[in-house]
């Protein structure tokens, strides 16, 4: 009988320990939740400008009113919206024919019939873009100095004020001639 008792204990003890171990692991089970996110470098913005800007609402401008100090101009906004992305430096290029015959680079389309006159395009800049007294010089609106590698593109949404001024540059061109003056411009947004 002693032998049977020992066998019974040897069966019960491992069974109880096994059951206790299973119960213990069920009680000790936990869960962990992880949210994975990433900031992807790249992106872009939409850029819009008025389809046309008429200085003095298209009224005639007497040539004698156009001097080195005159301000015959119209303002308009370049709008940046829908910006998405992260970590790159924005820039805006300005495409358009320009001429320096007046002593200063001015925008003027080849179809213009006036001579020695052009459009002096300038900007006061914005919180994100630097000012420029003459965009025909380097044909770009440059970004302010910031930590762009740590900046979300959504901060670029907004307006950049521009000013189009009828100009004769230094007004020293030998053959200043009145006529129709046009300047066709294209603004391109880059996020590099």
Segments (PLM) and residue ranges:
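Mature extracellular/passenger domains of Gram-negative fimbrial/pilin and adhesin proteins
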Residues: 2-5, 21-192
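Bacterial N-terminal signal peptides
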Residues: 10-21
């Amino acid at each position: 009988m002693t032998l049977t008792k020992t066998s019974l204990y040897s069966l019960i003890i491992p069974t109880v320990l096994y059951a206790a171990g299973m119960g213990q692991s069920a009680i000790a089970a936990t869960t962990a939740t992880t949210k994975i996110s990433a900031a992807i470098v790249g992106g872009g913005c939409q850029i819009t400008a008025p389809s046309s800007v008429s200085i003095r609402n298209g009224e005639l401008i007497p040539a004698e009113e156009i001097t080195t100090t005159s301000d015959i101009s119209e303002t308009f906004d370049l709008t940046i919206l829908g910006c998405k992305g992260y970590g790159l430096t924005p820039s805006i290029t300005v495409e358009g024919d320009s001429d320096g015959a007046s002593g200063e680079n001015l925008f003027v389309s080849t179809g213009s019939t006036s001579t020695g006159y052009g459009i002096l395009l300038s900007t006061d800049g914005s919180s994100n873009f630097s000012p420029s007294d003459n965009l025909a010089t380097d044909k770009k609106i440059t970004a302010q100095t910031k930590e762009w590698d740590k900046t979300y593109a959504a901060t670029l949404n907004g307006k950049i004020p521009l000013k189009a001024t009828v100009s004769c540059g230094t007004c020293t061109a030998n053959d200043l001639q009145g006529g129709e003056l046009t300047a066709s411009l294209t603004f391109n947004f880059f996020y590099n």
